[in-house]
Amino acid sequence: MSTSDRTWIGRAPGRVNLIGEHVDYLGGVVLPAAVDRFTTVRGHPADDWSMASGVPGGLPYARAVGEELGASPQALSVVSDVPPASGLSSSAALLVATAAGLRPDLDGAEAALACQRAEQRATGVQVGVMDQFAAALGRRGHALLLDCGTLDYRLVPFPGDLVLAVIDSGIHRSLADTPYNLRRREAESGMPQRRRHVESEIRRVHEFADALEAGDRSALGELLKASHRSLRDDFEVSTPEVDALVERAWVAPGCLGARLMGAGFGGSVLALLEMGAKDPFREALPDVVVRFCNTADGAYAR
C-alpha cells in the first residue's frame, strides 16, 4: 500500500563497495556493504514536487522515484550525513530512502530496481544496480554478495572489529571529462587488457567473500592491494596522486589493505582497518579527509 496520501518518513544508508570495481555494468559480481551514514526523507502530499534540504540537486532524483512508484506530488525535506561526491553513493541513499517512505511494503529488490530506473530517468545515465541494492538490502554486520547479471545475492558476515575508512583523494572530476566512457567501451568490446581486470576482479570478489567467512584478514588485505594494482595497471583508471595515497595507506598503522574505490580518475580510496587503528591511521594521513564507517542495516532489511 502506498503511503503517499499521508506524512511519511524513509531512511536509507550510504554504501561502500568492498571489492568488485568496474564489473557491475558487465554483469559481474560485487561485494558492497551498507554503512552508518544515513539519508532521512520526510514527505507529505502537495500540489507539486518540492524539496527543502541540504542535498544539492536532489529533487530530480526524488521526483523520478516517486513517479516511478506512481506517487502523487510530495513536499519533501531531507537530512543527510552521506557526503556527496564521497564514494558513499549519496544519490542511491536519497532514492532508496524516498522509496522506503513512499512504499515500505515493497520487496527490497523491487525497490532497488525501481530506484535504478528512476536514477536512469533522472540522469540519462545507464547506472548499475549495486548502489541501490546495498542501500535497500544491506545488513549490519554483513556485506552483500551481489551478482549483477542474475541479481542473485546473499549476505556475507563482516567482522565487527574491522573498520572501513573512506579517504577523499581531493581530486574530483566529472566522468565526462575523463576516459571513463572509453574504458567502459573497451571492456565491453573485449579488449584483452581490460578483460584481464574484469575476470581477475570477479575472482577476487569470490576470494574476498571466502576470506571474510574464514576470518583470513591477511588475505583480505592482499586482495584489496591486488584489486588496486589491477585498476591501476590493467584498467588504467587510477592517477599518480591516487596511487601515492593508496601506498601511504598501505603502510599506515593498522591498515590491512586499501584500493581505489569507484569510477576512478580521483575520488575516494577505501581502506580496511583494525578497530583500534583509527587514531594512528588518521595521524598518518593528516592532509586528507578520512571518514570511518561501520556496516549498517539497509532500508528494507528485515
Task: Spell out what each predicted region is.
Residues L106-L155, P253, A258-M261:
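Alpha/beta catalytic cores of group-transfer enzymes, especially the acyltransferase/condensing modules
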Residues R11-A12, V16, G20-D24, D81-T98, ...:
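Glycine/serine-rich anion-binding loops at beta->alpha junctions
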Residues G27-V35, N181-R184:
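Short Gly/aromatic-enriched secondary-structure transition segments
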Residues S2-T3, G10-R11, V23-D24, A33-A34, ...:
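Solvent-exposed alpha-helices and their adjacent loops that cap or buttress functional pockets
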Residues L31, A62-L69, L94-L102, F133-A134, ...:
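Buried hydrophobic packing segments
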Residues V55-G58, S77-L88, C115-T123, M130-A134, ...:
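Cysteine-centered functional microenvironments
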Residues M1-I9, D36-A118:
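Anion-binding (especially nucleotide phosphate/pyrophosphate-binding) glycine-rich loop
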Residues S2-R15, I19, T40-G57, R63, ...:
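C-terminal nucleotide
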